[in-house]
């Protein structure tokens, strides 16, 4: 039997949310009168998430489980769920219920109108501090200016993707997965629906500011060469300024006979240029590190157990 809709849910320590998550999902999916599956990816949870998932699977075989061998991170867990999803349309959604399952109706309606990607754009972000809202806004502005692809602002992973979009994403092999960028890169006919993001239902977010910072860097370095170009421009400007200053000192000495003092200014210049060089080396190192990860060609993830699914051939995981 053909599955029309796959719901993909990455999970890490979400035992407190599962009961309400499935209750709301089933309440939404049942009236749609389409064949569906719910792909739950357990990303190395340390609580009772896996046990509760198995109990849910025993009572409802439309709930299927991908149990990863360890914690690979949300982006990889999401990729695993997309790999195993069989539906004609796929909807990734968070397990914390900040993305309302009730919006699935609107996503499906837009898909039936002929759109290939229907993303859910946040009109408001309840339960988040002003600092997080401000940094998120700045991130979308920065990455929008630094990359050639248009990543929709205020949009997470919650969206509907047609099967041809999913197949295109599965062909993208990079190990550093910035899924929002990959979703935008493939193109196709896109539209959006607005929603008010709810506070997290229970538990604490797994994303602290350090993780969010690294996530932002992954997005920038994965989709932009501007950080490399900046140092070319900066180096050229510093070289021209240094040449102009050196010419000024030479002329001043020749015409006025003034000695050139200043060990302090010399030390400041050396330290400044040393700092610039170290930062530029760090940027180059970020790109080289990503090249190193790619050439190792390890699988994106390893699956420990499956419930309701069959193992994919290893070549599909590379």
Curated annotation (Swiss-Prot):
Regions that span the bilayer: 230-250, 264-284
Oxidoreductase as UniProt keyword: no
Keyword terms: Cell membrane, Glycosyltransferase, Membrane, Transferase, Transmembrane, Transmembrane helix
Protein name: Uncharacterized glycosyltransferase sll0501
Domain of life: Bacteria
GO molecular function, one term: glycosyltransferase activity
Enzyme class: transferase
Main location: membrane
One Pfam match: Glycos_transf_2
EC number(s) stated in the UniProt entry for this protein: 2.4.-.-
A single cellular component GO annotation: plasma membrane
Location of the protein in the cell: Cell membrane
Membrane topology: Multi-pass membrane protein
Disulfide bonds: none
